Each structure stands twice: as C-alpha cells, then as structure tokens.
C-alpha cells in the first residue's frame, strides 16, 4: 500500500513538474536537459566548432541540446561534432553520431576513433548514474566507478584544455569524488541546477583543464 502511494505521489509530481511540461513543449526527450542548459549558460561550455562527447546519452535530451547549440546556418547541419555513447539504444538525433555499447570495449573504441579521426575532444558531458540499491556504501562505490570511467575517458580522448561535466550524488563518497576531480583538473566547480528536484541529492561537478594529460 505504501509503495503504491509513493508511486502515485511520484507520478503526480512528475506530471505537474514545470520542467517536464517545458521539455514536452520544446521537444526535448527529458527534463534533464534544463540541468545542462543552466550549467552551460553560466559556464559557457558549448561553443561552435567543438567536438563533444555525451556519455550515457540515452534518451538523448543532452545531445539534443548540444545539437541545437551547434546548429549552423539556414542550410542546416551543425558547426561541430557530437558523439553519444550508451549501453542502451537511443532513437536517432540528426547530426549526432550514436554508438551503442560499453566504451571500455575495443569494438566501441574503434567506432569512436572512426568518428574522431585522430582529433581530441573539447568537452565530455556525463549524466550517467548507477542503479541505486539504497545501501549507501554500495551506491557510493558504484558512483565512484562511473566517475573514474569518465575521468579515464577524458585522459585518453580529451584535449588538455578541455572540460568534463559529470553527475554525482552529495552523500557517501562525494568528498572522495571532489578530491579526485581536484587531483585531475586545474579548476573544479560544483553546480546544483534549479532543474534538480528539491528532494534529490544529485550535484554536478565540472572539471576544467587537465593537470596531467597523457
């Protein structure tokens, strides 16, 4: 009974969420787009001509936003390159190169290199999150693993002057993640966008300029 009530409350909040309504109106696949939008508007992350990788891209709202920011002249197309990576499938988005699979696997990396053609990435964005169990220690370990994967990806594929934006949770293990970012990046910024739900502990970390690029 309690679970049904919880589900009904979530559904009510979701339906009446202004960001859900705005996403539907503006044609975005998820309300999460407004978290990236706010961070981008304050930090000026996305610029014409950039190569941008979206880790954990599905369902695609972040890639949609990046695509809109990089859209070119009236003739169509974009001024830049967008690559979405996810283990789950994603409906196609115009001008977005989507690769389904685990980016630790050689086959996926080969597909990535076919798109990059030796070029380095300007910006890596990640809305990846683990499946939460409710056990703080286990959930923190899963979150740290994802952050480590994102950092390792930037070390191998991003320009030294590039930036990494990741989602994490302000709880067990968060201080470790912040210190990890400070070890890896010259500038670290913590962001809590207005679109993050009040009850959510999610917070975004932005690292700018690698300290020790490979």
UniProtKB/Swiss-Prot annotation:
This is Ribosomal RNA large subunit methyltransferase E. It is an enzyme of class 2 (transferase). Its main location: cytoplasm. HAMAP family: RNA_methyltr_E. InterPro entries: RNA_methyltr_RlmE, RNA_MeTrfase_FtsJ_dom, rRNA-MeTfrase_E, SAM-dependent_MTases_sf. Belongs to the class I-like SAM-binding methyltransferase superfamily. RNA methyltransferase RlmE family. The active site is at residue 167. Keywords: Cytoplasm, Methyltransferase, rRNA processing, S-adenosyl-L-methionine, Transferase. It is found in: Cytoplasm. SUPFAM superfamilies: S-adenosyl-L-methionine-dependent methyltransferases. It catalyses: uridine(2552) in 23S rRNA + S-adenosyl-L-methionine = 2'-O-methyluridine(2552) in 23S rRNA + S-adenosyl-L-homocysteine + H(+). Gene3D superfamilies: Vaccinia Virus protein VP39 (3.40.50.150). One of its GO terms (cellular component) is cytoplasm. Its EC number is 2.1.1.166. One of its GO terms (molecular function) is rRNA (uridine-2'-O-)-methyltransferase activity. Specifically methylates the uridine in position 2552 of 23S rRNA at the 2'-O position of the ribose in the fully assembled 50S ribosomal subunit. Pfam families: FtsJ (PF01728).
């Amino acid at each position: 009974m309690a679970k049904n009530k919880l589900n009904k409350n979530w559904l009510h909040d979701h339906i009446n969420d202004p960001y859900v309504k705005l996403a539907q109106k503006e044609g975005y696949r998820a309300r999460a787009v407004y978290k990236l939008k706010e961070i981008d508007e304050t930090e000026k992350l996305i610029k014409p001509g950039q190569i941008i990788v979206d880790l954990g891209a599905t369902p695609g709202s972040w890639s949609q936003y990046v695509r809109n920011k990089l859209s070119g002249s009236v003739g169509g197309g974009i001024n830049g390159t967008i690559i979405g990576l996810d283990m789950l499938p994603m409906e196609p988005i115009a001008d977005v190169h989507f690769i389904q699979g685990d980016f630790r696997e050689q086959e996926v990396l080969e597909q990535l290199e076919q798109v990059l053609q030796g070029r380095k990435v300007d910006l890596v964005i990640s809305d990846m999150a683990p499946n939460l169990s409710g056990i703080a220690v286990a959930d923190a370990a899963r979150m740290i693993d994802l952050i480590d994967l994102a950092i390792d990806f930037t070390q191998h594929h991003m320009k030294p002057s590039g930036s990494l934006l990741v989602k994490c949770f302000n709880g067990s293990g968060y201080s470790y993640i912040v210190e990890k970012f400070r070890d890896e990046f010259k500038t670290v910024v913590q962001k809590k966008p207005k679109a993050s739900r009040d009850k959510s502990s999610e917070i975004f970390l932005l690292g700018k300029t690698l300290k020790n690029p490979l």
